[in-house]
């Protein structure tokens, strides 16, 4: 590394760099981090293993660029999550005493590329046949479109729906949805993808996929909509087919920074290349050991392709600031078993100072119920040792599939321990919220058949069968539903007609005010109409309150940031007049009520509001954004709750204590449909990604890591004998504690298996596993032959903690 090529700060700058904790901001960095930050005169790739401070490096680099006179509007910073984007922005704000950071193009791939598409709406209209009010369909809307198509092309889907086998039908739908996403993320024509032997479309035929894809694309186009994958696809097609537009963004972006580069797919790689100017600088930060999203199209090879294309200088961050030395050593030993993995030298920051040995605990259990009991007991034990250090939010239970969560949820609920299942149900998927959004979509887009169908399905239940026939007829004649219902003829005593006319009158009255009012006004009117016309379900009021909070937050956020960049990098005040200092600009004052009737110079419109909602795609994003913007905890953020989540959902998070559960063969690595028919190369590639997944899980832990597995597990309707994962055998034994492992050798496992078979264990355990699913109240059958594994409600943690003798203390 040539130190003389590291740029030193310019003496002349209009930006003030804040001192943090009495130190210069660069003194907050390690020598490795500082070198990576100060390299700004060429492209670079930063290898940043788990816990090595990659977010800090990226944010300090942005601050360093601006401090060296780089225009904020010429910096593009791309992330994969809103959480990462918000964290980066808040850290840059801490570093720089200047308001111009709002000019930085910082956000997720989808939010930035959607902005580019919106700014080039004329091209989008001409080439993609979508007018300027085009909608973005989320996964739920995408599924609704596919439901209209699949019966025509997939016989088994139609059969499963007729048998009312919802799960089987849903699995088919999600499988097709995934194939469509992967096709779009390749940036190639559908025929080209399905003809590629390496592109898996099993169990479907090429013609099926081609016809479904084209039909789906046409239905989106007819509804003036695109899905999430289209945001990337259309950006790629626009930039690759229009040199003038591509040149505009090449001229604009001098520096491009990309977080989690190992997760990029083909189309993201190509878009970045299209907006990269010849002498521009790209900084990619990533870790090939954390590439775990191949099912979304991410390609670990992109790291190698980046090096070949841009000849970057490589920087390696080798110190883990998150985890103990045992966790770091164990994770490193594991990942070295991957053949196609870069070699690493990674150490813990506490390697020299750590006095107490804290090995990773391996715990085996009789079955998944016993596993859940042991995990929760250990959580209680750790919490009681130090309640301040170990609040409930410092614990995480990580699993490979969502199905594994149930026994832990039952146990936590019975023990009265607060918990949160992450990524289970999106706030935006709730029926009442889908309904409100559908009304808003219809207001700006009469072509949106899907939204109108949802409105009738959710609101007009009494006439759903009649409307289904009308809509089916409209589909065949390719008519818009809105036109159809406007032309309905009344019949004698027709309540249906009266309801529909009332609905049409309401929608038309709102349309007349679209240019005069902001989204929060329409949200309130829609809620009033729904309340007056239809019945509400229990819990809807709370959801509506949260939606109102979100509408208020997004509106105020918009008006607090009116001064923005245009695409040429120039500042543009969007108001009709210059009203600097006007009280219409709301300066992060969340508690100030918004008057929906107030006339503003600049209107936040429904289209922008819907874009913002769709890009806040998780409950955590919504809550975090509202609370961060307000400066208060307007909405409880579930911070003091035990977190249950898949390993995929845990990416980017950290916890004091992590329990990785169900670490058995068939789950680690995960078996999947058609795996036995795969080539050796594909099976090996799959196993390497599964190993990376296990690496990600281990490196979420800061202090304590527990790896658990069960000897028997309920799979479908059968109880299967299970063996611990081969990955456990790949860990560094020196740093493992096997005292909780009942059977820690293959020989003992075979003896255990034999004893179970001799005792006719399958019959004995049928009733043991017969506990019912539950909602709010636990309801399961006790096994007459065994003591109940789960404590009664009267033995909950809160109840016992009040007793003089608490057995868990």
Task: Enumerate the language-model features and the residues they cover.
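Conserved RecA-like helicase ATPase core segment
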Residues: 2-12, 20, 26, 64, ...
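P-loop NTPase Walker
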Residues: 2-127, 247, 329-332, 699, ...
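Conserved helicase NTPase motor core
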Residues: 18-50, 56, 76, 84-87, ...
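Helicase P-loop NTPase motor core
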Residues: 45-58, 72, 311-313, 318-418, ...
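Conserved helicase core region in the C-terminal RecA-like lobe
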Residues: 107-115, 257-260, 285, 401-403, ...
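ATPase/helicase motor core of nucleic-acid motors
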Residues: 112, 309, 353-359, 386-520, ...
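Accessory C-terminal helicase-associated subdomains
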Residues: 206, 484-649, 670, 736, ...
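C-terminal accessory regions
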Residues: 471-472, 633-642, 664-808
